[in-house]
């Protein structure tokens, strides 16, 4: 059965895989999950990702990143902000800063999915999808 909220499903799979120190996790591929994975890779929270499978059965295999000693995950917290039942939007002036700039907020804008810093640079607002730190 397909989940209703694909973003929450993706974040939960990554969070659970980090908790048990798995090297990779698999999530269903959509344009949204691919874009979020790209932002996480660019910001250094994951090693990388690749698409496997064909047609409707495509999945993203996300390689998780850990600190060298003790295998501590780089991602401490993945927090969903905007949910299907309660959407959260922010204009360009009120974009959130996560932990004073240490973490990132992933924003869905009219120019694509990007971090809060990139949205400020491009002077756009949008839907606040999640916080990562």
UniProtKB/Swiss-Prot annotation:
- Gene Ontology cellular-component annotations: ribonucleoprotein complex; ribosome
Q: Which GO terms describe its biological process?
A: translation
Which InterPro entries does the record associate with it? Answer: Ribosomal_uS8 (IPR000630), Ribosomal_uS8_CS (IPR047863), Ribosomal_uS8_sf (IPR035987)
UniProt-listed Gene3D superfamilies: 3.30.1370.30, 3.30.1490.10
Claim: Ribosomal protein is one of the keywords in the record = yes
Q: Identify the keywords attached in UniProt to this record, alphabetized.
A: Ribonucleoprotein, Ribosomal protein, RNA-binding, rRNA-binding
Which GO terms fall under molecular function for this chain's record?
rRNA binding; structural constituent of ribosome
Signal peptide range in chain numbering: none
Keyword Repressor in annotation: no
Q: What does this protein do?
A: One of the primary rRNA binding proteins, it binds directly to 16S rRNA central domain where it helps coordinate assembly of the platform of the 30S subunit.
Quaternary structure, from the entry: Part of the 30S ribosomal subunit. Contacts proteins S5 and S12.
- Which family is it part of? Belongs to the universal ribosomal protein uS8 family.
Q: What is this protein called?
A: Small ribosomal subunit protein uS8
Native source species: Crocosphaera subtropica (strain ATCC 51142 / BH68)
